[in-house]
Amino acid sequence: MKNLLCAVMLTSPLLYSTAVFADDAQQLRNTLVNTASLKTDFKQTVTDVNKKVIQTGSGILALAHPNQFYWHLTSPDESQIVADGKDLWIYNPFAEEVVIMDFAEAINASPIALLVHRDDTTWSQYSVTKKQDCYDIRPKAIDSGIVTVSVCFKNSQLTKFNVLDDKGNISQFDLSNQKVITTEDKALFKFVLPENVDIDDQRLKTLN
């Protein structure tokens, strides 16, 4: 969960110039125009530094511009992350807990933010390098917890992304059944607070 947020995913050859990075970032931005909204199934595989599988999972991912995000892990243990553009909600049914965070504070720590952000300020926080059909995204902040996020496309459609964290773990997310968000799907970005759950409102801590 932490890796997804810091990731919900950065070296390049020294011969590449700053201008090349800028061009690669612009190419990625142009490609993401075709991903203004997306709903897809995903399968997650996490391997450690020794390439041993330490976790698997599956669920549903949805993205919409501007700044809307839905993540529902359905197996093996259920969890949800929902961003409505202002607030971000993290729901753990097993712990019966909901954490609420300011969207900008939470999502800006993640290279995945680039999938739903279009503003120059957010993009300036990352370096982008194109490698065939994939783009490696590196946060410029050294304490992000994420080393690289690689997002891959086929025929301009997002097909997978990988997250490499600072412990050497790689989280691979393979996407399938991609489709454009429908009017009915927009309800996914509105979190409905369950009854009888503990609430940890991080927004209040940010303000104080």
From Swiss-Prot:
Compartments, as annotated in UniProt: Periplasm
Keyword hit for Lyase: no
Main location: periplasm
Pfam families assigned to the protein according to its UniProt record, in alphabetical order: LolA
Keywords: Chaperone, Periplasm, Protein transport, Signal, Transport
Extent of the signal sequence: 1-22
Domain of life from the UniProt record: Bacteria
Biological process terms in GO annotation: lipoprotein localization to outer membrane; lipoprotein transport
Record's GO cellular component terms: outer membrane-bounded periplasmic space
Record bears the keyword Chaperone: yes
Record's subunit section: Monomer.
Family per record: Belongs to the LolA family.
Function, in words: Participates in the translocation of lipoproteins from the inner membrane to the outer membrane. Only forms a complex with a lipoprotein if the residue after the N-terminal Cys is not an aspartate (The Asp acts as a targeting signal to indicate that the lipoprotein should stay in the inner membrane).
Protein name stated in the entry: Outer-membrane lipoprotein carrier protein
Organism of origin: Shewanella putrefaciens (strain CN-32 / ATCC BAA-453)
Lineage: Bacteria, Pseudomonadati, Pseudomonadota, Gammaproteobacteria, Alteromonadales
Gene, per the UniProt record: lolA
